[in-house]
């Protein structure tokens, strides 16, 4: 506990009474200020979520998909991160980080807005030339966010930049666009990458049929979709029974909230604790 005042002996009752009154008054003002800031933060988080959802929905529509993919990525990202935080403190994440990564995950493919529609929605396998063009969506998305100069200090924007550019990197360095290896890849991009691959496997696309849940897990674990962080594979195996349930529940609600019901940033302030080829 902090000390806001002290009284020297001998005590004067009138002085004690006034000091107590001042302390109570100061505390009330502090609480009012905390509630005001918390309310502003909550409004900002809400506005961020609305804008992210709008932008990701635009990309999904152009990509010939519903918002289901974005929703699923957010849910999978959040439950993977929760499990990861329970297993290790290696990445020094807070609940605020978890919420921001889950929200930013909705922008992972925003760069596809710069890819030709004929390539995005081609029902056959892409040619090598088309595939090279498709791969550019990572850098396009990153560049779009980099151009938001006035928002570069925003944690949400920085995380979204990481995810956009590096969500197709692989743990063994065989991904793109930069061939990053291991934990050179930000954990935000690692988790979204795994969530993206799982959802791409288990859902129908214009060029492929959906793969059953168990088969998708097997393909990921055995490295058929590229190598992932062994810790994340452990997390995936530990939550694999919950994944279909979580996604089905979200589908019934027809919505998802990356911040969940527990806005940790605001709650913390109020408590003052404070390839898919």
Stretches with model-predicted labels:
Residues 1, 9:
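A Lys-centered signature of the CheY-like receiver
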Residues 7-8, 16:
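A structural signal for hydrophobic residues in beta-strands of small regulatory alpha/beta folds
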Residues 15-29:
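Receiver (REC) domain switch/output surface
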Residues 48-64:
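Conserved HAMP-HisKA connector
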């Amino acid at each position: 506990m902090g000390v806001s005042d002290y009284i020297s002996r001998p005590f004067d009752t009138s002085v004690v009474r006034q000091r107590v009154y001042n302390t109570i008054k100061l505390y009330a003002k502090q609480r009012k200020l905390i509630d005001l800031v918390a309310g502003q933060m909550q409004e900002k988080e809400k506005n961020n979520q609305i804008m992210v959802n709008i932008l990701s929905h635009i990309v999904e529509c152009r990509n010939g998909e519903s918002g289901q993919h974005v929703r699923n990525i957010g849910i999978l990202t959040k439950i993977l991160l929760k499990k990861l935080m329970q297993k290790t403190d290696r990445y020094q994440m807070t609940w605020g980080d978890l919420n921001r990564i889950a929200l930013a995950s909705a922008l992972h493919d925003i760069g596809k807005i710069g890819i030709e529609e004929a390539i995005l929605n081609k029902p056959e396998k892409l040619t090598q030339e088309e595939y090279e063009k498709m791969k550019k969506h990572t850098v396009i998305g990153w560049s779009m966010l980099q151009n938001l100069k006035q928002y570069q200090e925003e944690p949400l924007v920085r995380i979204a930049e990481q995810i956009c550019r590096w969500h197709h990197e692989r743990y063994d360095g065989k991904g793109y666009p930069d061939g990053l290896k291991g934990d050179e890849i930000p954990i935000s991009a690692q988790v979204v990458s795994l969530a993206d691959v799982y959802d791409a496997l288990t859902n129908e696309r214009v060029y492929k049929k959906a793969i059953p849940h168990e088969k998708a897990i097997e393909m990921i674990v055995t490295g058929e979709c590229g190598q992932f962080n062994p810790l994340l594979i452990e997390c995936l195996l530990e939550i694999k029974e919950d994944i279909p349930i979580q996604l089905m529940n979200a589908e019934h609600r027809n919505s998802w909230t990356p911040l969940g019901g527990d806005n940790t940033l605001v709650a913390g302030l109020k408590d003052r604790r404070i390839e898919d080829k």
